[in-house]
From Swiss-Prot:
Disulfide-bond pairs as recorded: none
Sequence positions that bind heme b 1: H100, H202
Cellular localisation: Plastid, Chloroplast thylakoid membrane
Protein's UniProt name: Cytochrome b6
An example Gene Ontology biological process: photosynthesis
Native species: Nicotiana sylvestris
Highest taxon of the lineage: Eukaryota
This protein's encoding gene: petB
Cofactor note: Binds 2 heme b groups non-covalently with two histidine residues as axial ligands. Binds one heme group covalently by a single cysteine link with no axial amino acid ligand. This heme was named heme ci.
Listed transmembrane segments: 32-52, 90-110, 116-136, 186-206
Length: 215
């Protein structure tokens, strides 16, 4: 085992990376409220794991979506637990994200030189809200259907581009299979990918610039 570690250490300098991570200075004013971003990340990872597990059973069609969710909840092994954890962690992620934004704002974390960190954080907050909107529709029950109809109908009030934008979101003039397919693709591929990209931008900047000062 030691030889295997030495082989990787010689090529990747694992110990130097570990020392850099563990030796980072933590200001004395840091408290539990500075952990809200990390908790949000943890919730996101739980979402990825549980969401991936549900893709084995979920069917993104208007005729089978609701039945597949019922199958997950009643027949799939531990399906009820996986979906429940997914829902609970989704609510927790949104709550922690909101509290994290407030904490950063109150402590001046958006000021120079952390402007870009703040911008990427705001984008991540928007992506988090988008997860909620798209995920809410996937069971394709009455609540999900009408929520999608209302949300996708909002841009219709915008002059000139409103109607084309509604059709782009829905995939057609009315809510249906094209809408569910779009929302499923957004929820399971586009949004997770964008979130991962912006997280990979967000965290190195925090690492480089450090934590903002106290109130």
């Amino acid at each position: 085992m030691s030889k295997v570690y030495d082989w990787f250490e010689e090529r990747l300098e694992i110990q130097a990376i570990a020392d850099d991570i563990t030796s980072k200075y933590v200001p004395p004013h840091v408290n539990i409220f500075y952990c809200l971003g990390g908790i949000t990340l943890t919730c996101f990872l739980v979402q990825v794991a549980t969401g991936f597990a549900m893709t084995f059973y979920y069917r993104p069609t208007v005729t089978e979506a609701f039945a597949s969710v019922q199958y997950i909840m009643t027949e799939a092994n531990f399906g009820w637990l996986i979906r429940s954890v997914h829902r609970w962690s989704a609510s927790m992620m949104v709550l922690m994200m909101i509290l994290h934004v407030f904490r950063v704002y109150l402590t001046g974390g958006f000021k120079k030189p952390r402007e870009l960190t703040w911008v990427t954080g705001v984008v991540l907050a928007v992506l988090t809200a988008s997860f909620g909107v798209t995920g809410y529709s996937l069971p394709w029950d009455q609540v999900g259907y009408w929520a999608v109809k209302i949300v996708t109908g909002v841009p219709d009030a915008i002059p000139v581009i409103g109607s084309p934008l509604v059709e782009l979101l829905r995939g057609s003039a009315s809510v249906g299979q094209s809408t569910l397919t779009r929302f499923y693709s957004l929820h399971t591929f586009v949004l997770p990918l964008l979130t991962a990209v912006f997280m990979l931008m967000h965290f190195p900047m925090i690492r480089k610039q450090g934590i903002s000062g106290p109130l």
